[in-house]
Amino acid sequence: MGQKINPTGLRVGIIKDWESRWFADKDYADLLHEDYVVREYIEKRLKDASVSKVEIERAANRLNISLHTAKPGMVIGKGGSEIETLRTDITNLAKGKRVHVNVVEVKNPDAVAKLVAENIARQLEGRVSFRRAMKQSIQRSMRSGIKGIKTEVSGRLGGADIARSEKYSEGTVPLHTLRADIDYGTAEADTTYGKIGVKVWLHHGEVLPTKKAASNEQ
């Protein structure tokens, strides 16, 4: 089971929190679709800004969005012009709700699965050998202090006629252990031979229950 399911979804409510945090008695479907549209817009507009995570919180007629990025300067823009345009566009998508955008800098992009996957995808688009791209990313991530990493690329690797998958890993990545902090990220590389999918799993160690949580269970 742990090998197949999305590691983040499996651990939500156990050691991971939701990325959309709000409650609705009615209009739930509309608000959920609004979240999807906003996330899709941010992903397209900030494709090159190394955005690893988008968190959305709602309160009354207000939308609070936290953007986790390795390139905050690109998101904010000169004199805050880019983030103001972003806020205006999201306000239109959110049907006039008040929008607040908070930018959170990612200090160590080599320890974030989404950014590692995007880096491998960029190298594949630049015609770098997939083996070299994966091995270099694994080495950089292991130097950043993580416990383990697993990478997988799928598609017409090296321009082969038949699509296949290749995996490389180092360290430990216990996907069945629910207390293991597994970060999972995906990306796509658009090459001349078609799309190549990239998946990355990072193991940051085990999250042990706090004393308060342990006492509640007892």
UniProtKB/Swiss-Prot annotation:
Keywords: Ribonucleoprotein, Ribosomal protein, RNA-binding, rRNA-binding
Any one Gene Ontology cellular component term annotated for this protein: cytosolic small ribosomal subunit
CDD domains in UniProt: KH-II_30S_S3
GO biological process: translation
Domain KH type-2: 38-107
Pfam families xrefs: KH_2, Ribosomal_S3_C
GO-annotated molecular function: mRNA binding; rRNA binding; structural constituent of ribosome
NCBIfam families assigned to the protein according to its UniProt record, in alphabetical order: rpsC_bact
Role: Binds the lower part of the 30S subunit head. Binds mRNA in the 70S ribosome, positioning it for translation.
Oligomer status and interactors: Part of the 30S ribosomal subunit. Forms a tight complex with proteins S10 and S14.
Protein name stated in the entry: Small ribosomal subunit protein uS3
